[in-house]
């Protein structure tokens, strides 16, 4: 009996190890492949789609339309950097100062403040499931290091802008621009880009199509930050265009 149990344990352990290695292989292949190829869909898109189907909503479709950085207004890249990660060109995937501030804030507040960089958000949205856990955070850190090592900053920003969620079923800046402004992403103004960036903390709660007072205030704050960073010159200076 003990031999049978031991044998079963060994088989299960081998199976688990193979599964882990297979997932790691897929992630490594994805990092290498998506360094040059358009991303057809992200883990978040798949999760949202299956969640809708399982809840009986068969009308939901996760829409996305890949575009290159040359087809995205420079204001859009600047807006998300101003809103989400102002040290994006300098760090290697993690903003240590922001993490320290978030930890100090979270120790004394009920409202949780995040400190994820654009690189971390890209890794999470592209490869991982939604939610909060130490396991997911650990995987996110490893994947972030992977894309920071293999991809350029321009590539990270390109992928981020193409898979970010901007509303219910709206993924990527091209889809968002067409949906909310009836124009391609290449023609977004600074104000429109700031409005899209303003909903990114919670695109299912905040609406670009019907912006609340909070979203409008955040839009104006983002515009001020964009000017302080140096406007379009910031993007050229850091070779993000």
Swiss-Prot record:
Pathway: Cell wall biogenesis; peptidoglycan biosynthesis. Keywords: Cell inner membrane, Cell membrane, Cell shape, Cell wall biogenesis/degradation, Glycosyltransferase, Membrane, Peptidoglycan synthesis, Transferase, Transmembrane, Transmembrane helix. One of its GO terms (cellular component) is peptidoglycan-based cell wall. It catalyses: [GlcNAc-(1->4)-Mur2Ac(oyl-L-Ala-gamma-D-Glu-L-Lys-D-Ala-D-Ala)](n)-di-trans,octa-cis-undecaprenyl diphosphate + beta-D-GlcNAc-(1->4)-Mur2Ac(oyl-L-Ala-gamma-D-Glu-L-Lys-D-Ala-D-Ala)-di-trans,octa-cis-undecaprenyl diphosphate = [GlcNAc-(1->4)-Mur2Ac(oyl-L-Ala-gamma-D-Glu-L-Lys-D-Ala-D-Ala)](n+1)-di-trans,octa-cis-undecaprenyl diphosphate + di-trans,octa-cis-undecaprenyl diphosphate + H(+). One of its GO terms (biological process) is cell wall organization. It holds the Pfam family Transgly. It is found in: Cell inner membrane. Its EC number is 2.4.99.28. It is a single-pass membrane protein. One of its GO terms (molecular function) is peptidoglycan glycosyltransferase activity. The chain crosses the membrane at residues 19-39. Belongs to the glycosyltransferase 51 family. Peptidoglycan polymerase that catalyzes glycan chain elongation from lipid-linked precursors. This is Biosynthetic peptidoglycan transglycosylase. It comes from Cronobacter sakazakii (strain ATCC BAA-894).
């Amino acid at each position: 009996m003990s031999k049978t149990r031991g044998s079963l344990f060994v088989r299960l352990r081998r199976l688990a190890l193979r599964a882990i290695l297979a997932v790691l292989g897929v992630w490594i292949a994805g990092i290498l492949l998506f360094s040059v190829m358009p991303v057809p869909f992200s883990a978040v898109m798949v999760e949202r789609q299956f969640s809708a189907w399982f809840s009986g909503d068969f009308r939901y479709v996760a829409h996305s339309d890949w575009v290159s950085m040359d087809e995205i207004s420079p204001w859009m890249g600047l807006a998300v950097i101003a809103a989400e990660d102002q040290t994006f060109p300098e760090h290697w995937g993690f903003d240590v100062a922001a993490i320290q501030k978030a930890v100090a804030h979270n120790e004394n507040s009920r409202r949780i403040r995040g400190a994820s960089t654009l690189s971390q958000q890209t890794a999470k949205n592209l490869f991982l499931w939604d939610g909060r856990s130490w396991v997911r955070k650990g995987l996110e850190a490893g994947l972030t290091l992977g894309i920071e090592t293999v991809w350029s900053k321009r590539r990270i920003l390109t992928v981020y802008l193409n898979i970010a969620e901007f509303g219910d079923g709206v993924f990527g800046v091209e889809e968002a621009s067409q949906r909310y402004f009836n124009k391609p992403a290449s023609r977004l103004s600074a104000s429109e880009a700031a409005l899209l960036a303003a909903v990114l903390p919670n695109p299912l709660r905040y609406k670009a199509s019907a912006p609340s007072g909070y979203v409008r205030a955040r839009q104006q704050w983002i515009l001020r930050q964009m000017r302080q960073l140096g406007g379009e010159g910031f993007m050229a200076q850091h070779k993000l265009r």
